[in-house]
Amino acid sequence: MKKKEIVDDVTMKRAITRITYEIIERNKNLDKIVLAGIKTRGVYIAQRIQERLKQLENLDVPLIELDTKAYRDDVKSEQDTSLIPIEIDGTDVILVDDVLYTGRTIRAAIDNIVSHGRPARVGLAVLVDRGHRELPIRADYVGKNIPTSQSEEIEVLVTEVDGKDSVNIIDPN
């Protein structure tokens, strides 16, 4: 099993900053935005985008945490640990996740969101898009496009959980 770092902490910070600038440029009503971090690492990436929006635009963007397990079609869990303390009707929800792969997690996140309200719009921001979609889902904001083979894995590490920021590609062969 080979593991190779393909994004270091500096490059990750730049990618998150670029995503933040794209969110600012493409959204006319920044005050209607709600960031929805997909547990676990998507929440930490969403928090960093939230911090950058505060620094750049002096904007307090609400952040909610989504647990997709109860909404997945491949792994079932009865317990939904989502934290959605605000009304999302009429808002522009931007889902935030670490890696976009098949699209199944995003579909589950959308199901979770619409079970709690009716946003005006749902967008998607991901740190890494690795391809291999099984569903017709495309990210609106992408930090890095990293084409992979089906057998390879992408591992995102964040300081808050793993003690460091990096993205690794793991080749099991």
Curated annotation (Swiss-Prot):
The keyword Acetylation does not apply. InterPro entries: PRibTrfase_dom (IPR000836), PRTase-like (IPR029057), PyrR (IPR023050), PyrR_bifunctional (IPR050137). A motif (PRPP-binding) lies at residues 93-105. Its EC number is 2.4.2.9. It holds the Pfam family Pribosyltran. GO terms for biological process: DNA-templated transcription termination. It catalyses: UMP + diphosphate = 5-phospho-alpha-D-ribose 1-diphosphate + uracil. One of its GO terms (molecular function) is RNA binding. The keyword Glycosyltransferase applies. Keywords: Glycosyltransferase, RNA-binding, Transcription, Transcription regulation, Transcription termination, Transferase. Homodimer and homohexamer; in equilibrium. Regulates transcriptional attenuation of the pyrimidine nucleotide (pyr) operon by binding in a uridine-dependent manner to specific sites on pyr mRNA. This disrupts an antiterminator hairpin in the RNA and favors formation of a downstream transcription terminator, leading to a reduced expression of downstream genes. Also displays a weak uracil phosphoribosyltransferase activity which is not physiologically significant. NCBIfam families: PRK05205.1-4, PRK05205.1-5. Belongs to the purine/pyrimidine phosphoribosyltransferase family. PyrR subfamily. This is Bifunctional protein PyrR. It comes from Streptococcus thermophilus (strain CNRZ 1066). The gene is pyrR.
